[in-house]
Amino acid sequence: MFELDFRALQELIRSQRAKVYEKFKRHVSINDLLSDRWETAEFYGFGEGTSCYNNVLILGDVRVGKNTWIGPNVVLDGTAGLEIGDHCSISAGVQIYTHNTVNWSTSLGV
């Protein structure tokens, strides 16, 4: 059975945080310390060279082209399909929603 050494894990996190702060002068979440933004984008099937923060909320059918940057705390709602092209920059906190306007408005959003 796998036994986790929490003290070693805490030390690893402290060490990684210090390295990131020294290099970039900023603090990042544990998720961002342990996962790679390009790996996250690849997991979602986004285009080559695209980076996507771990805390992005992705709903429905979202397609993203090559070399696009998706910042932290972004919401991409592809409920009615969403396609973002190549070489785009989606800033932190941006929220993009799609839906069938006629159906949505006549159903009172239900």
Predicted regions located by residue number:
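Terminal amphipathic alpha-helical/low-complexity segments used for targeting or macromolecular assembly
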Residues: 1-43, 48-49, 87, 102-103
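Flexible, glycine/small-residue-enriched loop-and-beta-strand segment within the central core
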Residues: 30-35, 44, 55-64, 69-110
